[in-house]
Amino acid sequence: MKRLFFIIGILVIGCSDFNPITSEDCDCGLEISSTLPYVNGSYELEYNQNLAQTYTMLDAATECGWSQHLQWDTNYQYRINTDWVSLINPASMTDEDGNAHVVFAAWEEFIGETVKVYCGYMDDHGHHFLDSLKIEVVDNE
């Protein structure tokens, strides 16, 4: 729940006009995507029944160069014993081209669910960026 408030906070702050730096000073951005099939506004992750989890890689493009720290989260978590586990790694760093990658993994219990993935960061000028996408976990085989 704390993560969700954090992400909403990034969105609210990122959309406000209180930052004195003009938008011309900022060449950065954020777009997250996947190579999964895109159907009706969501990416489709085909669950593999032969694995405990089915994995895919998500991509982020910032156009902001090396060493931007991106934070990731989802609107779902999975409980293992007493611990809540995210469906996505919580952080990644951009390469020299401003690109980053992160692993998303779903358990069988998520078949039929549409998971919303959030990614955000703040650039060197104090601008906040946030993007999201949806992944539907399906079992069509």
Pin down the residues of each PLM region.
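Short, surface-exposed loop/turn segments at beta-strand-coil junctions that are enriched for proline
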Residues: 106-111
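Sec-dependent N-terminal signal peptides
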Residues: 4-13
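C-terminal edge beta-strand
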Residues: 131-138
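Low-complexity "stalk/linker" and mucin-like segments enriched in Ser/Thr/Pro/Ala/Gly
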Residues: 29-45, 67-102
